[in-house]
Amino acid sequence: MKKNHFLQELSISATQKRNGANNSKNDVLKIQSWLNLFELVNSGSGTLTSIDGDFGPATEKAVMNFQKAQGIIQNGVVDAAVFKLLCSPLQTAFETIPTGNGLRQRIINAGKLHVENFPHELIIKNKSNSGPWVRSYMDGLEGTDMFWCMGFVQAIIDQAASSLNKNFKDLMPSSFSCDVVGEEALAKGLLTRFAKVRDDPSVVKPGDIFLLQATPHDWTHTGIIVSVGNDVFETVEGNTNNDGSNNGDRACKRIRNFRKQKLDVFSIEPLV
């Protein structure tokens, strides 16, 4: 994969524990982030704690609650094995080789796999769009202005393309900007405007990318089309929510009515 920052999210430099001599603020931040992400999926697990880089009694107890949930020794210490359990959703999402007949099906399957592992942003140091999932999609970047929907899309396409020894950069520029990608699609003749999509939905194929149009040269959100119906696309999207926001807090599978929304479509056919 070309987008491989996720590898840095899968390990810590040394065992971390309360008052540990080898404690690293960066490692503790990772641990606290995953403890919070675990609680989002496992409500009531008791692993919510501050994300401040300090391995104090609260973090120790949160680790013990995580260890209890996993059925392992409850000592409050995070070694390599415990951290591997903490970050296992991200490892599963990024390191599972997509399967399927051809690139389009592999893109769809990779997208679904990521969503099933619940990619979710966190608020760290009062900044949204933060945490290990966001950094993985955004090549290490995070923070309030780091809208990560395009990073999510490109990570999925990269993962699927790499499984077939293809380079996603042959299709589109490596950019987190919907506008940059949209203009490239226009220049290559790969962008079908929403009006034509409404007239003839058959021009759209699963695995293609939608770009939500604000104006003809301004796009505010993106995602991968999983299936096409008469009126709707089923999609997988990052940085969204149940309302379809372009700055939500998670990746999810959605249904969008392309007859009511201005959804331009970027064809991935040249990479197929």
Q: What residues fall within each predicted segment?
A:
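Secreted/periplasmic proteins that engage bacterial cell-wall peptidoglycan
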Residues: 33-34, 57, 61, 112-201
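Acidic, glycine-anchored loop motifs typical of Ca2+
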Residues: 50-53, 76, 217
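Conserved hydrophobic/aromatic packing and binding residues within compact polymer-binding modules
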Residues: 63-66
